[in-house]
From Swiss-Prot:
Binding site for Mg(2+): 18
GO cellular component, one term: cytoplasm
Single annotated GO MF: ATP binding
This protein's encoding gene: metK
Catalytic activity: L-methionine + ATP + H2O = S-adenosyl-L-methionine + phosphate + diphosphate
Pathway: Amino-acid biosynthesis; S-adenosyl-L-methionine biosynthesis; S-adenosyl-L-methionine from L-methionine: step 1/1
Cofactor note: Binds 2 divalent ions per subunit. Binds 1 potassium ion per subunit.
Record EC number: 2.5.1.6
Binding site for ATP: 16, 167-169, 233-234, 242, 248-249, 265, 269
Binding site for K(+): 44
Name of this protein: S-adenosylmethionine synthase
Signal peptide positions (record): none
Amino acid sequence: MANDYLFTSESVSEGHPDKVADQISDAILDAILAQDKYSRVAAETLCNTGLVVLAGEITTTANVDYIQVARNTIKRIGYDNTDYGIDYRGCAVLVAYDKQSPDIAQGVDRAHDNNLDQGAGDQGLMFGYACEETPELMPLPIHLSHRLVERQANLRRDGRLPWLRPDAKSQVTVRYVDGKPHAIDTVVLSTQHSPDIDLGTLREAVIEEVIKPTLPAELIKGDIKFLVNPTGRFVIGGPQGDCGLTGRKIIVDTYGGAAPHGGGAFSGKDPSKVDRSAAYAGRYVAKNIVAAGLASRCLIQVSYAIGVAQPTSVMVNTFGTGRVSDATITRLVQEHFDLRPKGIIQMLDLLRPIYEKSAAYGHFGREEPEFTWESTDKALALAEAAGTEPVAALAE
C-alpha cells in the first residue's frame, strides 16, 4: 500500500431502517435470554412503511410478547409519529417464527451441561481485528463515523436540534501517511429532518454542532470537505424511505472495511451461533494482542464446522508489526484463549440479555460494561509470556 493514501468508512444511526431491524431482532433475543438463557434464537426482522415482519427460528421455554417488544424498540428509537412513516402505536406487526431444525440442534444441544465440546451451530469463518489508531484500538474512520451518528442521535433526543429525525448516515475519509492517520479529508453526514428547516440552517448546524465537536483537533489540517445532506431534502427516511432488514450492515457493525468479514451477521442470533460469538472472540483476542504490545495491528481468522467444537483453523496476521513472530502469537492464542463455541460463551459470559445495545453504533470499540469482548484482561499474561511491554493505558 502506498505511503500516502485515503481510506473511508461509514456508519448509520439507530433510526436507519436496517438498524431498526437489527435492534428489534436483538431486543427479541434479549427478552428471550432474560427468561431462558439456553434458548436457540435466529430472529430476523423486516420493516417497511407501517409494517414490521418477525420471522426466523426460535426454540425456547420463554413466554415473550414479541409484538410488544418490537413496538417498544421502535418507540425507543424515536419513531413515534405517523409523519415519520412508521409509528410504534399504529404499525402492523406480523409474527412468523418457527423452531430450530432438529438437524441443526443435534450438534449443539448439549448447552445445559458442562461439556465444552458443544459443537458449532454452523460452519463459517470469522475475523477479529485491532490496531493502535484509537484508544479503543479501533480503525479511526469507523470510530469517527459511529461517533458522528451517535452525536446526531443525542442532539435529537435532548432537543438541541429539534428538527432532526431518527434516520442518518455518516462517512469519514482519513488521509494516512506511513500507515498512520494524518488528517481528516472528507466528512459526509446525511440526516433526516423535519420539512420546515431550510437547508442552509441545517448544514451550518450539523457542521458546527455534530461534526466539528466529534473530530480530533490534531487531525483537522487544511481544508476538510464537509458534505451535509448533499442531495438536499431528506424528509422521507427510516423504514418509509427504504425497507429495513436484519443483517445488512455487517461492515458498519465491525471494522468499516479495514479488516475482512466472514459474511455472517450478528443481530438476532444467540451465542451458540459462531457467526456472532466467534467474531466477538476474535475481537477479544486481537485487542488483547495489541494491548499486550505483541503487535500494533492484528487480524485473526477462525473457522468452524457444524457440530464440531474445535476450530478448523486459527490464523494470526500482524502485517509486519509484530514484536514476536505470527507463529508465536498463534501459539499464545491457542494457549490463552478457549475458542471452542462453549468455551467462548463461558469466557465472555455471553448467555445474558446484553445484545440490543450492540445493535447500533458498532459491536466493537465501545467501552460498555456488558461488552466483555472489549476487555484487555489477558494483556498482561500475554505480554509476560511473549516478553513484551503492554500498552500501559489498556492492560488491566
